Amino acid sequence: EYPAIPAEMHNDFKELVECVVDAVEAMVRSTRAFFKDIAAVADHMHKVSYWEKQSDKISTRLQRNIFRQNELQLSHKLQLRDFVIHVDQIADQAEDVADKLSIYVIKRSL
């Protein structure tokens, strides 16, 4: 599938992708800190949570904007919505990894 994204939504999609990338990068930094400097893990995990929340907000706003477009066909709206959901799920999975990592940090510190 190749979703045709309307020009007026390009900035919102770009903002969503940037937040998701920031969440994943914070998760990677958190994982690296687990092996090098365990005290720094918590700071990176907070950043993962922050970026995931931001991506959720942008995702919700974008989905609302998609369904407010009267000139798009329903099938196109559904395709764009699914695309937004899949991109947002990447940030959700990064947060899941960070949550599991926090459990390992607690176990390691005992």
Identify the role of each PLM range.
Residues 1-110:
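Cytosolic, long alpha-helical scaffolding segments
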